[in-house]
Structure formats: structure tokens, C-alpha cells
């Protein structure tokens, strides 16, 4: 495909117009009195939302230079959303403000590289001030307050607080569709995985078609269980104890399966066979998780263990196991707390080190099954459009609440940024800057007022008046746009997670630095649209 190239001011101006088109669309949603944006769809009903990243994703501009500018800001919104689940609009507004302030200086002849260094240094100091000002989340009400602000719905805030209170920080909260109107909250006790019984003959409870094993032994093997002698040895060991047996294996087939089923039907020996979840290395890891949870050892050729020669020491134990057609739940495994804690620490380290979003999600699920639990918020609404929009807001609010637990809370409404910047301006790392680096730092201190101004203007109040008033207030006090009052925002429940505010500023500063140091843009040349056929052409005359 042919390319078009522009340089210097022309390049930056084209990108700036694209950035402004996207940012001006997104920023009307900021704050408690922010407006909605309607997104037209190629098929189906339009979507109505006030979620910054959803709006940004839908914007695709025709002009190639404008498209590149818009894509840069989309990256800010997406990165902030991925890390913290909220703050996308704040990040977009900050990026726009930083770029505008920076370009004024670039046009006036400042060195973009020096400006970028100044922006980075000022951002680093402000982030330190934000972290220092953080307040730990101590109550369920604080979680509810921050989730309520993110989702703009008190009922959602309460459900998320209840879910996280139950499953803990390491637990997983998933959001699913509900067949009926409203919100429902379900909890999973113990470790649950999505594999059910291999054959319905293992069912013990005909009413709900489940196999319930009380105080069972648990055999975990990474291979197939096929021959009769594979199973007879283990079955005889367990039969002597009078307890049931759960077998989790790659598969149970051949002579082994009918042997188990026949003994089950006769009442000679109660058991249930389940396929191991996952594939490949992930299956091995999940089997090892189960082994640690239940105090078992995985029987595998790699370890030199054979089914025909094992004893009860390799079998795990649990208080109860419930197996349905589609899933298995292990309740109160008998593994040692020390081993479980060590495994949890190992999975946490893997989460920190992975670059793959998919791997991180799967590791988080494993962590939840070992350390916390799983809560499911079921969402129902009058229309499919409303349900989809509400579901998305709840997913964001869950990540927002987890971010608050992880790094703490700050006063919301853009106030924390302004107050942290006021302290950062006096820090030696900033006052020691000279020349154009000092100019770069000054750009950050001016641009950082943009979110609070936008929140005020969306609420119908002068942004400049609000900024001047907030500067004179003690730390933690600011403008509550929901009530049009100045008050202690932490006490009023108007809070933002540190992670959200920090990520928004860092991502905005990163993109602004790239924008200012751009000297050329290479874009795809738009393909000419084919001309419409002349009237009367190809009519057979």
C-alpha cells in the first residue's frame, strides 16, 4: 500500500486534530454529572454508554493523520483500563491537556526531548506524592463507595463489596447474564472446575443429578485409567476404610470405567470419575494445585509412580465433593496451610512476571480457587442493550474495587492530582530542574488541573472557580460535583483508587512525551473510492 508522509508542525497538527476529536467526545462523560454518548452499530440497536474506553474503541477517523492521533489516545485509555479498570476518561483528558500545553512550547522553539524529560521527572514526583497520600481500605463501606462511583450505581457497589468481602482480594468476581431482571450474587465454596462426571451412573442425588461424596479419598493422575488392574488396587485400599473415592484423570475408560460403575450400582463401593480440567502444561499445573489443596500426590510416570503399586499416602482428602454433569467442586481440602500458602505465593509471582493477558487471567483463576473463592454477579435488565452496558460497568467496577484494596484510596474528583502536584512543585527533584526540563515540569503542573476543571464544567460550574477554591482547602477536601458542595471527600465516599489515578497520569504522560517528540508521520494513503456508474449504463442498449 502506498504511503503519505508529513513532517514537523504539519505532522503534529494532523495528529492533534484526531486526538482532540476523540478526547472531546470522551471527556463529556467525566464525573458524576457527565453525559452519555450514543454509539451507532452496523447491526442492531445503538449502545448508550459513559465508559471512556468503550467510546474510544468505537472512534475510527477517515483522515490518516487524525486516525494516528486518535489511536495514540486510545492506547492511553486501553492501558489504564487494563491495569486499573477505570480512569480511562481521566487519562484521556490528561493526555489532551499535556499535549496542548507541550505543543505551545514546541511551536515556540523549545527542545521536545528536554520537555519530555521534564514531564517524566515531574510525573514521577507526583506519583510518589499520590502513593504517600493513600489511605488503606479498612471497611466494606469504602469498597462499596469506590465501586459505586465507578459503576454509577449504589446497588452494584453493595454487591461488589459483598462479593469481595466474601472471596477476598485474591478471589475472582465474574459477571454473567441473568435470565431474570435485577442483580443476583452467587458464591462458590471450595475449588470448582468445569468438568463433570464421566458417566451419569455415578449420580447419588437424583433430584439435581449430582454425585455427592462425603469425606472422600481423592486420586489424582496425569494419565488415563483404562485397565481393570489399574483401578482394582486403589479401590481395594479405599474400600477397607469404608470411604468413597473421587478419581480425577486424563480419562477413565476401557475395563476400568464399567468396573467402577458396576460397583457403584451394586452399592459395593461408592466412587466417581472425572476428567482433569485444562490441557497440556495448564492441566499439569491445575492437578498440582488440587494435590496441594487436598494433600495428595499426582500419580504420574514422570514421578515413577504406578497405580498398581501406590498406597493411601498418595491419595488426597476433602470434607465433601459435589460433582454435576458439567462441574466439580472440592470443599475443604485436607492440604496443609503452609503448602497452600507457598503455592499461592508461587502463582502470585507468575502473575507478576507474565506478559500475556490470557495467561494472567488463567493464573488469577487458579489463585482464586486456592486462596479465595469465586463470586458470580448475575446481571439482568429490561433490554439486551441495557444488560450489556450494565455488565460492562460492573466488570470495570470490580477491577476498580480490587485496585482500591491493592494500593489504597485517594480523594476523588481530580482533587488528589491537584493536591499532590502542589506538594511536588516544592520537592527538590522539581525545584532543582533548570531550562527546558523545568518548562516540561511546568507543563505537567498546568495540565494536571484538566480533570477537575472538566468535572466541574460537566456539572455546570466554572472550572477556574473550583480550581482556585480547592487550592485553598486542606488536604482531602475538595469539590463534590454530585452535591455541588466543598467537603471532606474521603468522608463523603468520593474516592479514587491510587492505582487508577497513578496509572491515568503515567500513561497520559508517556503518550504526551511520544507525541511531542514526533517529527514525521508515515501514514497509509487513503484508497480512492470507485466512481459511481453513469446513469443508464449497462442497461443492454
Curated annotation (Swiss-Prot):
CDD domains named in the record: GroEL
Gene3D superfamilies according to UniProt: GroEL (3.50.7.10), GroEL-like equatorial domain (1.10.560.10), TCP-1-like chaperonin intermediate domain (3.30.260.10)
Cellular component, GO annotation: cytoplasm
Keyword ATP-binding: yes
Keywords (A to Z) from UniProt: ATP-binding, Chaperone, Cytoplasm, Isomerase, Nucleotide-binding
GO MF term (any one): isomerase activity
Protein's name in the database: Chaperonin GroEL
Taxonomic lineage from the root: Bacteria, Bacillati, Actinomycetota, Actinomycetes, Bifidobacteriales
Gene (UniProt): groEL
